[in-house]
């Protein structure tokens, strides 16, 4: 039986200094830092999670900040553009806000929608689009109030070394619906109302190189542990090499690299980011995986200090 994902769970990228990263995603874009922890495989590196007030799936962008990291190259085998969705009528606010913080942007139209495209301080390609769908983000930070706040992901643009094979995966395995073709892009839509629109570029542009300003992986939603195990079996049955389940504290994760060389993850919606903090205090303290807690002092000494601060 075919399966269907509700859409994007989170997107994880590599960036530079954590203060620059936090100033942009919290200070400029108004997202909430819902979790500060460390990389499970490299406890000397932060893992920072930004999203809506509740840190819900479909709103979470996560970062490995490496100060002084080599600049990456955006290209095939990666998410090329991360799309954010805002309420109808909010675009004028965002254009003024980007201007206020001297962030250059361009306006484009794709599939009948108006987008504002810009880069973060470390070179990640971002865009904003207005849509009715998706619940409002009730978080207020600085001048970013719920009537204009980013709701979460509008979706993403995928760059593939083998677009035909990636297209087959999206439609026939991940369960997305093909809803249109325009120029060099095919559009897919998932069943969810956030993180639900995927544009696939049909022409390869050259292999990307991992580094600052590039996306490391895109994660798709599984309802729960049982659903994730179904996904694991289902994907493996189609010839993909899938990892064992990995406990990431706030979700369980499995990974596989699709034929276009993009690293895919399937992550469970539960338990979520209030798993080890209260909803009210999420993101305020460094939370460590249990195996690293005995080494907290040493780990904290090796991490660059940063703070969430209003820039308005």
UniProtKB/Swiss-Prot annotation:
Cited InterPro entries: Extradiol_RC_dioxygenase, Glyas_Bleomycin-R_OHBP_Dase, Glyas_Fos-R_dOase_dom, VOC
| Induction comment | Repressed by MhqR. Strongly induced by stress due to exposure to 2-methylhydroquinone (2-MHQ) and less strongly induced after diamide or catechol stress. Not induced by oxidative stress due to hydrogen peroxide or methylglyoxal.
Enzyme's top EC category: oxidoreductase
Instruction: Provide the binding site for Fe cation.
Output: 10, 217, 265
SUPFAM superfamilies on file: Glyoxalase/Bleomycin resistance protein/Dihydroxybiphenyl dioxygenase (SSF54593)
Q: Where in the cell is it found?
A: Cytoplasm
Give one GO biological process term: response to toxic substance
Task: Report the co-factor binding details.
Answer: Binds 1 Fe(2+) ion.
Domain VOC: from-to ranges: 7-131, 152-269
Q: Name one GO molecular function term.
A: metal ion binding
GO CC entries: cytoplasm
Give cofactor(s), names only.
Fe(2+)
Instruction: Tell me the Pfam families matching this sequence.
Output: Glyoxalase
Q: What is its EC number?
A: 1.13.11.-
- Family classification: Belongs to the extradiol ring-cleavage dioxygenase family.
PANTHER family from the entry? RING-CLEAVING DIOXYGENASE MHQE-RELATED
What this chain does, per the entry, is described as: Putative ring-cleavage dioxygenase that may contribute to the degradation of aromatic compounds.
* Name this polypeptide is given: Putative ring-cleaving dioxygenase MhqO
Gene (UniProt)? mhqO
């Amino acid at each position: 039986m075919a399966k269907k994902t509700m859409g994007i769970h989170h997107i994880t990228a590599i960036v530079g200094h954590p203060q620059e990263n936090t100033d942009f995603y919290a200070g400029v874009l108004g997202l909430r830092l819902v979790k500060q922890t460390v990389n499970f495989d490299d406890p000397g590196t932060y893992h920072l999670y930004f999203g809506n007030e509740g840190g819900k799936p479909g709103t979470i962008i996560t970062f490995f900040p490496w100060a002084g990291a080599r600049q990456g190259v955006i290209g095939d085998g990666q998410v090329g553009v991360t799309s954010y969705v805002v309420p109808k009528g909010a675009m004028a606010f965002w254009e003024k806000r980007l201007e206020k913080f001297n962030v250059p942007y361009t306006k484009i139209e794709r599939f009948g929608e108006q987008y504002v495209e810009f880069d973060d301080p470390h070179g990640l390609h971002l865009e904003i689009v207005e849509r009715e769908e998706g619940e409002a983000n009730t978080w207020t930070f600085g001048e970013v109030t719920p009537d204009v706040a980013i709701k979460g992901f509008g979706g993403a643009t995928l760059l593939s070394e083998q677009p035909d094979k990636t297209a087959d995966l999206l439609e026939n395995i991940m369960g997305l619906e093909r809803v249109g073709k325009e120029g060099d892009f095919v559009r897919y839509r998932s069943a969810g109302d956030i993180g639900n629109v995927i544009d696939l570029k049909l022409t390869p542009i050259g292999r990307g190189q991992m580094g600052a300003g590039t996306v490391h992986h895109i994660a798709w939603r599984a309802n729960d542990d049982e659903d994730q195990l179904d996904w694991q079996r289902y994907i493996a049955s189609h010839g993909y090499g899938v990892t064992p389940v990995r406990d990431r504290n706030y979700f369980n994760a499995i990974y596989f690299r699709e034929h276009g060389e993009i690293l895919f993850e399937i992550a469970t919606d539960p338990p979520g980011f209030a798993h080890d903090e209260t909803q009210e205090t999420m993101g305020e303290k460094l939370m460590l995986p249990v195996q690293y807690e005995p080494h907290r002092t040493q780990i904290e000494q090796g991490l660059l200090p940063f703070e969430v601060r209003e820039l308005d």
